[in-house]
Regions:
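Ordered hydrophobic segments in well-structured contexts
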Residues: 4-9, 30-32, 84-92
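A short, exposed loop/beta-hairpin motif centered on an aromatic-Gly-Thr core
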Residues: 24-41
Length: 119
């Protein structure tokens, strides 16, 4: 069986590393690749684009990254409060989460460097 790689973009009131039961509803874009290098390049390109659009970025596990603007919120009637909206990016191999492409801090630094470089 050949490996397939996916880059998935989400938009949700939960950061992309929280895989709640209905998390797939939050997928807004998905790209599939036959090789790792193309998938990682797309992942980095999308991270750079998101980092230019949204001033806040946080990495956690599974090479998931959340981007957000503090003004993008939705009101939750059930909790009677505003919820922050997040734009997430995640990398998968054979429909499994990838734990490490690089170290998370190294990845975050690379994204910031690429974002500044292409301006």
């Amino acid at each position: 069986m050949e490996n397939t790689w996916k880059v998935i973009m989400t938009h949700s009131d939960a950061e992309p590393w929280w895989f709640f039961e209905d998390w797939k509803r939050d997928i807004v874009k998905e790209w599939e690749f036959d090789n790792k290098s193309e998938a990682v390049r797309k992942y980095l390109d999308e991270c750079v684009a998101l980092s230019r659009e949204f001033p806040n970025m946080k990495t956690k596990k599974y090479n998931s990254i959340a981007f957000w603007n503090e003004n993008e919120v939705v009101f939750c009637e059930a909790c009677d409060d505003d919820l922050q909206m997040y734009h997430g990016i995640i990398l998968f191999e054979n429909d499994h989460l990838i734990e490490n492409v690089d170290t998370l801090e190294g990845l975050k630094e690379e994204i910031q460097s690429l974002a500044n470089e292409k301006l």
